[in-house]
């Protein structure tokens, strides 16, 4: 089962990814984790990436694809894998295709921007414990304070509306075109193309997961 999840920030990809890797016993492949591991091991690709990062540059798609190919040779990928945060751009998607790294399913978790903003901007954190509340979906007993300690809750900078709108802007300009790319490829009838599915990201975690599993196992 070789999977990729697409969707905007706050669409619930991380939650569903955790459930999927547990169900199918496949690893979650993160380019960030791969970069850190390759640098720690001192592999040729890792050393190349380290030099670029230390000089403030962006790691090239060639290096990223090389890291992906290396990672997929590990025995834990024999049953498949789930891509996390990769590819991010059309150039990376084309590079993945050219490298003959095949996918079985690409799943878009679709959530309206305004709902994403409501989901994320409503989060409130009790910093010392890490407890998370939501002003609408999971409010504290008393507004603005932690249920257990009575200490104040904060809104992280990343959860502020202005920041979320910027992240959504980046998603729509860079990553959202991947939806069209994989959709058109699937519709082309190519044997190499993964199946493409769009599911609603609105509902409970279990409902969304059940919908994904139904798609994958039908």
UniProtKB/Swiss-Prot annotation:
InterPro entries: Adenyl_kin_sub, Adenylat/UMP-CMP_kin, Adenylat_kinase_CS, Adenylate_kinase_lid-dom, P-loop_NTPase
CDD domains membership: ADK (cd01428)
Superkingdom of this protein's organism: Bacteria
An annotated GO BP: AMP salvage
Annotated localization: Cytoplasm
Class of this enzyme: transferase
Record-linked Gene3D superfamilies: P-loop containing nucleotide triphosphate hydrolases (3.40.50.300)
Annotated metabolic or biological route of this protein: Purine metabolism; AMP biosynthesis via salvage pathway; AMP from ADP: step 1/1
Entry keyword Cell membrane: no
Binding site for AMP: 31, 36, 57-59, 85-88, 92, 156, 167
Chain positions recorded as ATP binding sites: 10-15, 123, 132-133, 203
Keyword Cell membrane belongs to the record: no
Region (LID) location: 122-159
GO cellular component terms, semicolon-separated: cytoplasm
EC number: 2.7.4.3
Alphabetized SUPFAM superfamilies for the sequence: P-loop containing nucleoside triphosphate hydrolases
PROSITE patterns: ADENYLATE_KINASE
GO molecular function: adenylate kinase activity; ATP binding
Region (NMP): 30-59
Summary of subunit composition and partner proteins: Monomer.
Job of this protein: Catalyzes the reversible transfer of the terminal phosphate group between ATP and AMP. Plays an important role in cellular energy homeostasis and in adenine nucleotide metabolism.
Family: Belongs to the adenylate kinase family.
Domain notes: Consists of three domains, a large central CORE domain and two small peripheral domains, NMPbind and LID, which undergo movements during catalysis. The LID domain closes over the site of phosphoryl transfer upon ATP binding. Assembling and dissambling the active center during each catalytic cycle provides an effective means to prevent ATP hydrolysis.
Name of the featured protein: Adenylate kinase
Organism for this UniProt entry: Legionella pneumophila (strain Lens)
């Amino acid at each position: 089962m070789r999977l990729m999840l697409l969707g905007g920030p706050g669409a619930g990809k991380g939650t569903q990814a955790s459930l999927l890797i547990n169900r199918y016993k496949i690893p979650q492949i993160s380019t960030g984790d791969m970069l850190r591991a390759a640098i720690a091991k001192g592999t040729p690709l890792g050393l190349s990436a380290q030099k670029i990062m230390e000089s403030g540059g962006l790691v090239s798609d060639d290096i990223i694809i090389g890291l992906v190919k290396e990672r997929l040779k590990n025995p834990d990928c024999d049953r498949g894998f789930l891509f996390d945060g990769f590819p991010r751009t059309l150039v990376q998607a084309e590079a993945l295709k050219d490298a003959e790294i095949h996918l079985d399913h690409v799943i878009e978790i679709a959530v309206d921007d305004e709902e994403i903003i409501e989901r994320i901007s409503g989060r409130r954190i009790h910093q010392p414990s890490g407890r998370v509340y939501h002003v609408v979906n999971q409010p504290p007993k008393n507004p603005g304070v932690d249920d257990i300690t009575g200490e104040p809750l904060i809104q992280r900078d990343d959860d502020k509306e202005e920041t979320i709108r910027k992240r959504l802007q980046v998603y729509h300009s860079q990553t959202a075109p991947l939806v069209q790319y994989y959709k058109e490829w699937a519709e082309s009838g190519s044997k190499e193309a993964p199946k493409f599915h769009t599911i609603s990201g609105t509902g409970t975690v279990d409902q969304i997961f059940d919908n994904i599993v139904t798609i994958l196992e039908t």
